[in-house]
């Protein structure tokens, strides 16, 4: 899910942090991709476009493999070097959210059954989307496919978004590819959304830069984390009556959640029973990840042609001609080679931010910068000429 209303809040208060690009703009970039959100997009897209999931002769769903194979080839032929990161065990704090999701899926399954009986195609499609989730088996199938393609994977001990952020902060990747906005809360330097969307949707990539978000909102990263908790995340409930605008205003004024709590009217804004904000804050700031220095070398290998044909065509029932065409594109990419941009290997240097970021900004606005309008000096040569 990510962070509620964070995208719209950034669009309104830090618009320069967001820009739109096409895929080719990221040629030479290494991108850590959240595999779970990608798989969900593939399952949704193919169900929507085809009206049903793709299946092999044994009745097994293959939509996730279809999407993973062809979209990864598309990324690589555009010069992007993907690293797919898979979720590990969900944190204990997320158990409440997972239980809610399970209940919503069960409810959607019942509604889907009723919509099918009535024959309402719009409702069928709507409820069908709500029942979709990637299974553990589908995760393992995608891992196998990527290994055969020669694409590196990382198994996160916990949340994939947190591991993606660690890869970015440690200089192993330039950006995170995910739909979850909490990637920014976790400290990813650049977030790319819609990276694995179907091309049929014709949506540009949305790029969000964390440092520009903090500048635009005039917050430190610690304050931003507290803002995200107030907005609503996967790990705790929200305070009733405090929406996105009020959350932003209160963090801007009070700087942290504990001071916000001290200054609200608890009759109007009751604190929920489950509001372990200190634990959630710690989870965002120090998540369970494999540190970059402890990871094995990340390498893009030659595709296993025979293995791919055996798996996709022999086991999964894919069209052999199309698979061969995909493999040829992969091989061509490997033969041509795309040079990784040099700045990919260096983590973005964060400028020191005072806890009272607002006062620093005010000072900045009142002091003229060297070379700025109103502070230009006349060239020395002209001064000398005037003395003659």
UniProtKB/Swiss-Prot annotation:
Cofactor note: Binds 2 magnesium ions per subunit. They probably participate in the reaction catalyzed by the enzyme. May bind an additional third magnesium ion after substrate binding.
The keyword Nuclease belongs to this UniProt entry's keyword annotation: yes
EC assignment: 3.1.-.-
Region of interest called Disordered, as start-end residue ranges on this chain: 349-388
Record's comment on post-translational modification: Phosphorylated. Phosphorylation upon DNA damage induces relocalization to the nuclear plasma.
GO MF entries: 5'-3' exonuclease activity; 5'-flap endonuclease activity; DNA binding; magnesium ion binding
Complex formation: Interacts with PCNA. Three molecules of repG bind to one PCNA trimer with each molecule binding to one PCNA monomer. PCNA stimulates the nuclease activity without altering cleavage specificity.
Protein name: Flap endonuclease 1
Source organism: Heterostelium pallidum (strain ATCC 26659 / Pp 5 / PN500)
């Amino acid at each position: 899910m990510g962070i509620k209303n964070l995208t719209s809040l950034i669009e309104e208060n830090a618009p320069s942090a967001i820009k739109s690009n096409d895929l080719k703009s990221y040629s030479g970039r290494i991108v850590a991709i959240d595999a779970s959100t990608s798989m969900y997009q593939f399952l949704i897209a193919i169900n929507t476009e085809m009206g049903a999931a793709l299946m092999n002769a044994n009745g097994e769903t293959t939509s996730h493999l279809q999407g993973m194979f062809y979209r990864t080839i598309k990324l690589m032929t555009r010069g992007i070097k993907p690293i797919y990161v898979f979720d590990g065990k969900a944190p204990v704090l997320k158990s409440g959210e997972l239980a809610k999701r399970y209940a919503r899926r069960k409810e959607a399954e019942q509604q889907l059954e009723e919509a099918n009986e009535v024959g309402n195609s719009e409702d069928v499609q709507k409820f069908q989307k709500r029942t979709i989730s990637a299974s553990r088996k589908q995760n393992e199938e995608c891992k196998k496919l990527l290994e055969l393609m020669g694409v590196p994977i990382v198994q996160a001990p916990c949340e994939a978004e947190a591991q993606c952020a660690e890869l970015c902060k440690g200089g192993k990747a330039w950006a995170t590819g995910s739909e979850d906005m909490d990637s920014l809360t976790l400290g990813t330097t650049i977030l790319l959304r819609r990276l694995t969307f179907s091309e049929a949707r014709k949506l540009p990539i949305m790029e969000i830069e964390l440092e520009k978000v903090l500048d635009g909102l005039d917050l430190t990263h610690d304050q931003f984390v507290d803002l995200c908790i107030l907005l609503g995340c996967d790990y705790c409930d929200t305070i009733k009556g405090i929406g996105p605008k009020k959350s932003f205003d209160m963090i801007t004024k009070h700087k942290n959640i504990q001071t916000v709590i001290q200054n609200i009217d608890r009759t109007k804004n009751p604190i929920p029973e489950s509001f372990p904000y200190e634990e959630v804050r710690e989870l965002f700031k120090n998540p369970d990840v494999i540190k970059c220095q402890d990871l094995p070398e990340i390498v893009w290998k030659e595709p296993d042609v025979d293995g791919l044909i055996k798996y996709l065509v022999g086991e999964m029932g894919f069209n052999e001609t199309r698979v061969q065409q995909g493999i040829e594109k992969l091989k061509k990419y490997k033969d041509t080679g795309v040079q990784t941009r040099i700045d990919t290997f260096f983590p973005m240097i964060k400028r020191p931010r005072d806890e009272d970021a607002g006062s620093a900004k005010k000072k900045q606005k009142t002091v003229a910068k060297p070379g700025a309008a109103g502070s230009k000096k006349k060239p020395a040569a002209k001064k000398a000429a005037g003395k003659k």
